[in-house]
Design a protein with these regions (language model features):
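Conserved N-terminal subdomain of the carbohydrate kinase-like
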Residues: 22-24, 50-130
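Glycine-rich phosphate/adenosyl-contacting loop at the front of the ribokinase-like
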Residues: 5-75
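Structural motif
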Residues: 15-17, 129-132
Length: 134
């Protein structure tokens, strides 16, 4: 008989708490969402497991890009904080096939606000098998 616990990996639920950004590719005029926590959630979901993201968003088009992408992929971000101001971003260009980072806004609004976890947040987090914070 199977031991109690996580069981098969496809039933594993992971929540990542922390950063989200968009890389703004100046050479292409496009934005691509990312950040270690968002990337972790996406890779988990790509492997047919459940993932959720808990972080801080600004109220600009960069935040909308991340939120829309997570929604499209099916990653829950319902417990994220939303603040007035710029979401985190990095400015990127390409030199031949290499990415060159030109600068960033150092996380935008995320650096200005603590998480201030609520009891509801903590209960929500308890529903996951793995918690990662970056």
């Amino acid at each position: 008989s199977e031991k109690k616990g996580i069981g098969k990996m496809e039933h594993c639920k992971i929540i990542a708490v922390g950063d989200n950004v968009c890389d703004k590719y100046l050479s292409r005029g496009k934005m691509y969402p990312g950040g270690q926590c968002v990337n972790t959630c996406v890779y988990v979901k790509m492997n047919n497991m459940e993932s959720a993201y808990l972080g801080k968003y600004g109220d600009d088009e960069v935040a909308a890009c991340v939120q829309d992408t997570l929604k499209e992929i099916g990653i829950d971000d319902s417990h994220c904080r939303r603040y007035e101001g710029e979401n985190g971003f990095a400015l990127v260009t390409l030199k031949e096939t290499d990415r060159v980072f030109l600068g960033s806004n150092k996380g935008g609004i995320a650096k200005e606000h603590d998480f201030g976890f609520t009891k509801e947040d903590l209960e929500y987090i308890k529903g996951f098998h793995l918690f990662t914070q970056i």
